[in-house]
């Protein structure tokens, strides 16, 4: 279920503009008519070692997009448009690396693009007086790296780069060891401890991204 996350970044594409050649692979994006900043929310890149049964990249990407859509201050490119651009990015181009000149060509007609990298998602059993700590509650440690580029100039400019870290209490009956975690997609997921933890993470990330984009639009 997780193989698509790596293939997204492994496909090749040169997005240097429109070409009339038969072999052109440029993605044409119609310029939106809007006064809001035009933003791409790239799919979350998962480098964690979680043991969840679903695609956490899909889940977190959707949650961040939903939050920003609710805020209503940014114009987000559709998921289909984002996928069309992202899945063709040249192999080896890392948005968290030192060489990022390709970002402007890779995301044409965008004013900003936000990248996310899940670097930690671990459930740690809490120590207790019980002989087997796995029978008790746990602490969920999550870390997400975010990097936002301003693409309005000649070269992409990083306007936000940080790691958001959070810890959340998971009651014993909802820990991974109890095999009772409500999966993403279940109607009860949003009110489960794991669902609430993910929502709080995405809420903070969405707020940070929006704040920095709007701040740079005023400067």
Locate each region found by the language model.
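Bacterial N-terminal signal peptides that target proteins for export
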Residues: 1-8
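Alpha-helix termination/capping residues and helix-transition junctions
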Residues: 12, 33, 106-110
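C-terminal/domain-edge helix-coil "capping" segments
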Residues: 18-35, 123, 136, 141-219
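Post-signal peptide N-terminal segment of mature Sec-exported envelope proteins
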Residues: 27-49
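N-terminal segment of the mature soluble domain
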Residues: 38, 47-120, 147-161, 204, ...
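Extracytoplasmic/secreted cell-surface and envelope-processing proteins
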Residues: 123-129
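Extracellular loop and loop/strand-boundary signature of outer-membrane beta-barrel proteins
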Residues: 130-134
